[in-house]
Design a protein with these regions (language model features):
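A structural motif corresponding to the C-terminal lobe/cap of the Radical SAM core domain
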Residues: 1-94
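Radical SAM enzyme core and accessory elements
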Residues: 60-175
């Protein structure tokens, strides 16, 4: 998915495309403009519809999605976790982009999500989700959200990395 390439594109149109894409449960979403070496082939154009500030914002949102959703293997649980927050995926990724900037793991810092261990990305996801659920006054759901992320993360590492895991849940699984 690109931004500021096609004539008439805008930040709103990019965010709408991102929201639509996440609703389709894709295994990952590629953003060639955030990948090393590919940026020159997809140079964004400043227009009356897409300012330089909008382009930086779109790049940061794309990088946040790449980190949280694709590298973070959030496909199976993303929409379930967003529903109680009553927030669109694009807004969630925009907030995560701001969080990444504050935690020195954004696009400009040179952070490469694919070079990180999945457990490290999962820790980032859990910290950010805790903050979002507190912000939206949904603290009572934090243990459930943490369990969903941890269980799915452990299953994805078992399938992808052949890594077994013992996870601690907030409930007794035998009940």
């Amino acid at each position: 998915m690109t931004y500021a390439i096609v004539p008439g594109d805008s930040l709103k149109a990019f965010m709408d495309r991102l929201d639509f894409a996440v609703q389709q449960y894709p295994n990952h979403i590629d953003f060639p403009q955030t990948e090393n070496g590919a940026a020159e082939a997809f140079e964004p154009n400043v227009t009356g519809f897409f300012s330089a500030i909008d382009i930086r914002g779109a790049r940061n949102v794309a990088f946040a999605c790449r980190t949280f959703y694709s590298t973070g293997r959030a496909v199976p649980w993303m929409l379930s976790v967003l529903k109680p927050l009553k927030i669109y995926p694009s807004k969630f990724f925009a907030d995560f982009a701001e969080w990444q900037l504050c935690n020195n793991c954004d696009y400009k810092s040179g952070f490469l999500p694919e070079s990180q261990n999945h457990k490290d990305i999962e820790k980032m996801q859990l910290v950010f989700l805790d903050e979002k659920y507190e912000e939206k006054r949904c603290q009572d759901m934090i243990p459930l959200v943490n369990d969903i992320v941890k269980i799915n993360g452990a299953m994805s590492r078992l399938v992808s990395d052949d890594e077994e895991a013992v996870i601690e849940t907030s409930y007794n699984p035998d009940d």
